Amino acid sequence: MMTVDPIQDLRNICLQILQSVNSNTLLEEETWDYNTLINNIDLPKQTREALRRSASQYLLYCQRKNKTYTTRKPLPAKAKLQLVETFSKKRYLTRCEKHQLAVQCGITTNQVQIWFANRRKRSKDLNNRD
């Protein structure tokens, strides 16, 4: 049975494993550090290492599952017009030009770079289709 707390879930899984292997009272105590928990289990070293890797992956999975993502925000209309106008004049920008355009548009230089790369790809695809 899985709960909301991944550490508690891991503890329950370890308890189930130990019940099938041998009895160990360590897990019945309130131990929240899974490394300490696994180190004190009376199992072969390889089994402990595999359990540690699994526990680590499980905790990462739980953290990713509960992560909130920010939604993508479209470029401002003013920025898009400026980018299109600049692209019609010049398809490749220098680092300095990217920075100046980003400041003018109120976006990051990375957004300018990606926008230009995407626009070049779209232009190439449209030309190849014709």
Swiss-Prot record:
Keywords: DNA-binding, Homeobox, Nucleus, Transcription, Transcription regulation. The keyword Transcription applies. It comes from the Eukaryota. InterPro entries: HD, Homeobox_CS, Homeodomain-like_sf. One of its GO terms (molecular function) is DNA binding. It is found in: Nucleus. Residues 68-127 bind DNA. SUPFAM superfamilies: Homeodomain-like. It holds the Pfam family Homeodomain. Its main location: nucleus. GO terms for cellular component: nucleus. There are three genetic loci for mating type genes in C.glabrata. MTL1 seems to be the expression locus that determines the mating type of the cell, whereas MTL2 (containing MTL2A1) and MTL3 (containing MTL3ALPHA1 and MTL3ALPHA2) appear to represent silenced repositories of mating type information. Mating type proteins are sequence specific DNA-binding proteins that act as master switches in yeast differentiation by controlling gene expression in a cell type-specific fashion. Belongs to the MATA1 family. This is Mating-type-like protein A1. The lineage of its organism: Eukaryota, Fungi, Dikarya, Ascomycota, Saccharomycotina. The gene is MTL1A1.
